[in-house]
Design a protein with these regions (language model features):
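N-terminal nucleophile
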Residues: 1-155
């Protein structure tokens, strides 16, 4: 498996956490036993979640439940991801506190959405603000005119 290939040659694998989701929805996960408690991962079709130093082992389950609830609605995929991150944060998240957050979504024939917040006192609020900016009509007008793999000459 891809998980085995990526971890077998890594002498530090016991300290690593690996979460993989491919373009077909297949998932793989690894949590080395030297990661700090509470550690866990959850891998199912189209979704993989994990963490270490979590407030409790249920954090990924809370995130999964929020994600599945929202994907049953007409919410945009990236908004489902953002709301799942917020749910994990609200469920206790990382015991050290949360200072960063990111979302990256790659579409086959469109530009990726790549939002990242580093070292911020309110990373979830800031990530939401960045996402909201991408939905602004003026921004969308610009973004929608950028070249994409299927429309490399648009402007």
């Amino acid at each position: 498996s891809v998980r085995d290939e990526l971890t077998k040659a890594d002498d530090g694998r016991q300290w690593r956490q690996l979460l993989v989701l491919d373009g077909n929805g297949e998932t793989a996960a690894w949590t080395g036993d030297k990661n700090r408690t509470e550690t866990t991962h959850l891998a199912e079709r189209d979704l993989v979640l994990g963490g270490n130093m979590l407030a409790h082992a249920n954090v990924p389950n809370v995130m999964r439940d929020r994600f599945h609830t929202l994907t049953q609605t007409s919410q945009r995929f990236e908004l489902c991801l953002l709301d799942a991150l917020v749910a994990g944060f609200e469920a206790g998240g990382d015991v050290r506190g949360t200072t960063s957050a990111m979302i990256k979504v790659v579409y086959p024939n469109a530009l990726p959405l790549d939002l990242r917040v580093d070292d911020h006192p309110y990373p979830m609020t800031e990530l939401q603000r960045l996402y909201d900016m991408t939905r602004d009509p003026e921004y969308r007008s610009f973004f929608d005119r950028l070249p994409t793999p299927d429309k490399p000459h648009q402007y």
